[in-house]
């Protein structure tokens, strides 16, 4: 028996899916999409398990998060310690309740544009070598191929002021945040040209009012001549 991608689609009243016990199952990632009331899956199969609204799949070598119930109302997802991959990107993005995501020691995070718009913070286990989190904002780890580079600024992070970490590389990508009003840029931080342009034009932070940039930063002149809000050189 196969659960194909989007086998259940836009079933707005669907609340529970029950799979036959001990059946020969193949449940593909995101088998139910647009099912925003689905909060429970019943399954008794050695290759699958449910934990905290997430269906995990065992491929005989490792466990992966295969489906995130779109109607599961918990505001925090702690990725199971045994999970090595997140395959449920579409169903996760469709969940409007999750505010916090905590990555375990070794799992990779979906790209920022694939994360829920309701997300306010991302945290990581202390021994995770891929990433570090600064005030709920996710960066690549210092010993990776993209050291200290921004991975994701959560779309619904409620902070009105954010200070980029020292020596960080700030690259927003396509994620937008409407809450930020003041951005602080230390001179040791690098802001990608494209990101700086979008910041100054109000594309990524549409309600940004003030940029505080440290004296000695290579971005001072561009910010002064481009940003129409308040510029403070400190």
Give the label of every model feature segment.
Residues 55-67, 138-139:
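Extracellular disulfide-stabilized recognition modules
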Residues 111, 194, 221:
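Alpha-helical elements of the RecA-like P-loop NTPase motor core of helicases
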Residues 5-8, 31-32, 91-92, 174, ...:
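Periodic small-residue-enriched repeat registers in elongated scaffold domains
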Residues 1, 9-26, 35-53, 68-85, ...:
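Structural signature of tandem-repeat unit edges
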Residues 60-64, 143-148, 203-204:
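Short, solvent-exposed loop/turn segments that connect beta-strands within catalytic domains
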Residues 87-88, 172:
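Short internal loop-to-helix segment that lines adenine-nucleotide cofactor pockets
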């Amino acid at each position: 028996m196969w659960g194909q991608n989007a086998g259940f689609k836009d079933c707005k009243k669907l609340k529970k899916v029950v799979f036959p016990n001990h059946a020969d199952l193949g449940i593909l990632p995101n088998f139910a999409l647009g099912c925003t009331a689905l909060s429970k899956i019943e399954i008794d199969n050695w290759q699958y398990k449910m934990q905290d609204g997430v269906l995990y799949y065992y491929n005989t070598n490792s466990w992966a998060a295969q489906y995130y119930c779109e109607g599961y109302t918990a505001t925090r997802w702690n990725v199971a310690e045994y999970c090595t991959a997140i395959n449920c990107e579409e169903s996760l993005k469709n969940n409007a309740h999750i505010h916090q995501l905590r990555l375990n020691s070794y799992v990779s995070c979906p790209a920022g544009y694939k994360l829920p718009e309701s997300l306010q913070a991302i945290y990581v286990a202390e021994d995770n070598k891929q990433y570090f989190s600064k005030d709920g904002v996710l960066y690549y780890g210092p010993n990776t191929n993209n050291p200290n580079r921004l991975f994701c600024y959560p779309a619904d992070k409620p902070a009105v002021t954010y200070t980029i970490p020292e020596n960080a590389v700030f690259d927003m990508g396509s994620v937008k945040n409407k809450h930020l009003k003041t951005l602080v840029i230390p001179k040791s931080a690098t802001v990608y040209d494209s990101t700086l342009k979008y910041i100054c034009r109000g594309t990524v932070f549409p309600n940004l009012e003030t940029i505080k940039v440290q004296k000695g930063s290579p971005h001072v002149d561009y910010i002064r001549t481009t940003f129409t809000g308040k510029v403070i050189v400190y």
